[in-house]
């Protein structure tokens, strides 16, 4: 049997022993290929069950088409076509996707729709952050909130650099996957999953709590599940429809917050006691001492940045250059409203009353500033706005977790069926419906005990932010040649990481009773992901112990199905070994 030939990047002929696993297919005329100039696709035939592997030279590709290749078995490594020439982009798409169809009607999100999806979550924080922060920081709350704005300013470039260098869904999971290992990346993914699940339940419950101010007969147990179900259906309709709803909610919320700021300023200008009220509040005795109060207030104020990381989990659905703009817009909102409301409250309400309204400080400010004084119309408007925007935070969780789980299934960290789309709206129905079931069950289990869930999601998303900064540093070291138009300097990354880590320590100290819940939720999620991640090893173990023949046949069939999926393997030479 004559030996076959393989070609390197310089088009030189290299003899290959006939026992080599890389045997080029006999229909390839390599002399013709050499004489005709550069070639862009060579099929390597792997004997046995491996099918056909196609070598695609992306560096030399200049827009021309490449000849198709016929697989050796029934694997979908190469697309079926009657045409002798298939575009390279379609070839790569068919290698990655389970089906060759593309949705040409898919439209990428613009700046404001992309901002609204994540912005509803982070902008809803002004409804509760000022009140919560005042419990520890008191009259110094606005200082703690400005420190949080500084952290987000640093993280704008940290997130932007990673998103532009690796524009794929997944957030911290994405950057750690490309710079470390699947195991480490899965830890970040589990933290993100826990954060989204807890955020959805807490936001839905808080929204219904505000809704009870408008309708006292509202049953919170069923209303929360109905709200989760509504956004499940909305997400099933598609991201474009969800983004339109999110944009409407975002505009209404920003308008309502602007109205409240105007009414507060009007109240301060009319009242002769505003300055006196501020001086009296400022002279209130601190709970411990000023630095400690500001520190614990800073930890609680970091609750207001939940949602900032969500934009990186649907970056593939955003248009070119949109991702950094979404981060900038969210930073504007948080930096403007959160510290401002905390400061304005010192002019119109005594400190004792501010601390009494821990969860509804803005509604109380609306009552104080309503004109005429006896009316409560502004309180009603703020309650309605809170119902809307906290509901929008539920939508943020749906969109974020869909992008993350879809990415994990593509990377085979989770079952591939989760990434399947329906023919109706081309959405990932298994992920969306599964998330609805999990959040509804969690709401039923906790039965309104939101303190533990709030502590869980606080620790989770701050841990994710810390891992994102670590991923940025590893990216600079390992993948420094990747192109990106925004670059976060080393001092910015290190300072941002330290500030988030310091805030995380404060949150852990303040939530020590809830650490057990965090470990429980994270442990269950991590166990499920690890079982999926190592499912082939689990199947091999079950096959080893034996059993009925039908059982073994089913296990072997499932094992072979997992192993036979097509994949892309990038190599610098013609020899993948």
Predicted segments, located by residue:
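Membrane-interface "cap" regions at the ends of multi-pass membrane proteins
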Residues: 2-129, 157, 177, 287, ...
């Amino acid at each position: 049997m004559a030996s076959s030939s393989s070609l390197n990047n310089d088009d030189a002929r290299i003899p290959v022993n006939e026992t080599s696993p890389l045997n080029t297919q006999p229909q390839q005329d390599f002399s013709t290929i050499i004489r005709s100039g550069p070639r862009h696709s060579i099929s390597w035939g792997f004997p046995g069950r491996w099918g056909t592997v196609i070598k695609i030279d992306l560096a030399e590709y200049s827009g021309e088409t490449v000849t198709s290749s016929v697989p050796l078995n029934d694997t979908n490594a190469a697309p079926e076509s009657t045409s002798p020439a298939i575009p390279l982009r379609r070839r790569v798409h068919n290698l990655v996707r389970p089906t060759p169809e593309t949705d040409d009607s898919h439209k990428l999100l613009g700046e404001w729709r992309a901002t609204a999806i994540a912005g509803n979550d982070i902008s809803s924080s002004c409804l509760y952050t000022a009140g919560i922060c005042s419990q520890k920081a008191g009259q110094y709350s606005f200082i703690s909130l400005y420190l949080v704005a500084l952290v987000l300013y640093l993280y704008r470039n940290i997130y932007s650099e990673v998103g532009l260098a690796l524009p794929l869904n997944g957030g911290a999971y994405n950057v750690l996957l490309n710079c470390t290992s699947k195991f480490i990346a899965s830890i970040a993914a589990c933290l993100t999953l826990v954060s989204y699940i807890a955020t959805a339940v807490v936001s839905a419950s808080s929204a219904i709590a505000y809704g009870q101010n408008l309708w006292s007969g509202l049953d919170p147990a069923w209303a929360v599940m109905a709200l989760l179900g509504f956004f499940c259906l909305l997400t099933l309709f598609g991201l474009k429809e969800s983004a339109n709803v999110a944009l409407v909610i975002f505009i209404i919320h920003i308008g309502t917050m602007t109205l409240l700021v105007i009414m507060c300023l009007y109240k301060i200008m009319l009242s002769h006691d505003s300055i006196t009220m501020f001086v009296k509040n400022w002279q209130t005795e601190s709970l411990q001492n000023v630095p400690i109060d500001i520190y614990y207030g800073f930890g609680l104020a970091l609750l207001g940045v939940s949602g900032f990381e969500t934009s990186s989990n649907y970056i593939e659905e955003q248009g070119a250059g949109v991702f950094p703009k979404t981060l900038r817009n969210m930073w504007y909102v948080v930096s403007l409203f959160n510290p401002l409301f905390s400061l304005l409250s010192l002019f119109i309400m005594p400190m004792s009353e501010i601390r009494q309204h821990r969860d509804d400080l803005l509604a109380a400010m609306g009552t104080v500033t309503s004109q005429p004084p006896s009316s409560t119309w502004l309180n009603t408007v703020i309650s309605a706005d809170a119902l809307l925007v906290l509901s929008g935070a539920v939508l943020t969780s749906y969109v974020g977790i869909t992008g993350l789980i879809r990415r994990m299934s593509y990377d085979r960290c989770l079952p591939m069926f989760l990434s399947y789309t329906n023919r109706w709206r081309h959405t990932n129905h298994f992920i969306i419906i599964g998330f609805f079931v999990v959040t509804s069950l969690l709401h039923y289990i906790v039965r309104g005990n939101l303190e533990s869930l709030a502590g869980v999601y606080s620790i989770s998303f701050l841990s994710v932010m810390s891992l994102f900064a670590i991923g940025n540093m590893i990216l600079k070291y390992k993948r420094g040649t990747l192109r990106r138009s925004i670059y976060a300097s080393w001092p910015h990354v290190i300072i941002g990481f330290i500030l988030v880590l310091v805030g995380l320590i404060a949150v852990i100290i303040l939530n020590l009773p809830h650490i057990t819940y965090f470990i429980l939720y994270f442990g269950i999620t991590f166990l499920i992901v690890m079982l999926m991640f190592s499912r082939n090893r689990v199947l091999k173990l079950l096959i080893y112990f034996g059993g009925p023949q039908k059982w073994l046949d089913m296990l072997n069939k499932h094992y072979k199905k997992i192993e036979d999926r097509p994949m892309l393997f990038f190599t610098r030479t013609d020899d993948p070994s």
